[in-house]
Amino acid sequence: PDAFSDGIDDNIFAKIVACIRVAVPYTGMIISTRESKACREKVLQLGVSQISGGSRTSVGGYVEPEEPDDLTSEQFDVEDKRSLDEVVHWLMDLGFIPSFCTACYREGRTGDRFMSLCKNEQIHNCCLPNALMTLKEYLMDYAAEDTKIAGEKVIAKELEHIPNEKVRGIVIERLKEIADGQRDFRF
């Protein structure tokens, strides 16, 4: 907060996040790597719905490793410097399901269509299955071994929470297909 004349501390920021979640329950809220790990953990518990990890903010940052002494082209300072894999593992340790889902946008479930599914509580028939399938893709393609092990446990546990038996069966089949190399399934 000291870097800006109107900066706020983490406690005020957390209160703002909580107020937004109560006032606008269906809105998406994203927390960036600008915030510390501790701040990010706190606001996740208060209703942040998306979190970044392994962010690079300098030109070419994803192509070439950023050197600690050569960060002059950064767009902003990154406080949480953990890798994406570390953030994914941390989220699972906290009891969250890391999801890389973009299905609603890709299927045109935005605006009124999305809100209708949310208010009727039907979005759950899409979100949990899509979260598990995209997590499985991440585990197969990018995860460190310990993250893979943790992720497989999360998937096995969370499959039980898919209420619709038919949907659960489809997800189980698709998870096997993902393990066999197929990608891009979505509900």
Predicted feature descriptions by range:
Residues 41, 46-49, 55-187:
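Radical SAM enzyme core and accessory elements
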Residues 1-2, 9-38, 45, 50, ...:
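Conserved C-terminal portion of the radical SAM core fold
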Residues 5-12, 75, 79:
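Alpha-helix N-cap and loop-to-helix initiation/capping positions
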